[in-house]
Amino acid sequence: MKIIRKIVKSCKDDEMQKPNPVSAPPDDDDLWLPPPEYVPLSEMTGKKNMRNFCINGEVKVCSPNGYSFRIIRHILSSFEGVYSGNRRMIGLVKVVIGLALSGAPVPDGMNWVYKIRRTLIFQWAESSGPLDGEELEYSQEITWDDDSEFVGLQMRVSARQCHIQGRLWCINMNSRACQLWSDMSLKTQQSDEDKNTSLLLE
């Protein structure tokens, strides 16, 4: 056990703040949860409260014994309560983390690294979202440890407004990203002025 503990410590990032522990997942945690209410985006027609963001996102999964998405989903279900970043951009962070984890990981020692670098279009509901010109630098670690297994998520997201043509963030309703957004309780609603647009409520 001491050897495992030493291994675990070696794949943690000393620069990260003290991680937030998460309790063990229930037996039925692997059940699929429906995604939040939204419709697939086609083309932005409404320009109200719309922002283009240049995004860099990284999620590093640290686990000496491997990991399953059941545990990752359980860790992310606590995201709303432990998020330590700018609350005006929590919706953006949830979207980026979901999209990053939907990609293919790159092994890095005992870690698996998921990265996303993209320009994304977001549209927020009235009085929601970041201030004009506001930027984000967010990093946090959330862990799950039950003395027999350790899984840690190291998350980094940077976002700045830019004028590069952005892509729409919403993808296939049955994708892994939608499951992760559901786990993180992503809050959205359909736009009144554009039925093909989802507005972020956070």
From Swiss-Prot:
Which Gene3D superfamilies does UniProt cross-reference here?
A: Rhabdovirus matrix protein M2
User: Is Membrane among the key words of this record?
Assistant: yes
Classify the source by domain of life.
Viruses
Q: Which InterPro entries match?
A: Rhabdo_M, Rhabdovirus_M_sf
Q: Any idea which UniProt keywords this protein has?
A: Apoptosis, Host membrane, Host-virus interaction, Membrane, Viral budding, Viral budding via the host ESCRT complexes, Viral envelope protein, Viral matrix protein, Viral release from host cell, Virion
Q: Name one GO cellular component term.
A: viral envelope
Which Pfam families does the entry mention? Rhabdo_M2
Show where the record puts the motif PPXY motif: 35-38
Q: How does it sit in the membrane?
A: Peripheral membrane protein
Q: Which cysteines are joined by disulfide bonds?
A: none
Q: Does the keyword Membrane apply?
A: yes
Q: Which Gene Ontology BP terms does the record give?
A: viral budding via host ESCRT complex
Q: Where in the cell is it found?
A: Virion membrane; Host endomembrane system
Q: What else is known?
A: Most abundant protein in the virion.
Family that this chain belongs to? Belongs to the lyssavirus matrix protein family.
Q: What is known of its domains?
A: Late-budding domains (L domains) are short sequence motifs essential for viral particle budding. They recruit proteins of the host ESCRT machinery (Endosomal Sorting Complex Required for Transport) or ESCRT-associated proteins. Matrix protein contains one L domain: a PPXY motif which potentially interacts with the WW domain 3 of NEDD4 E3 ubiquitin ligase (Potential).
Q: How does it assemble?
A: Homomultimer. Interacts with nucleoprotein and with the cytoplasmic domain of glycoprotein.
Protein name, UniProt field: Matrix protein
Q: Which organism is it from?
A: European bat lyssavirus 1 (strain Bat/Germany/RV9/1968)
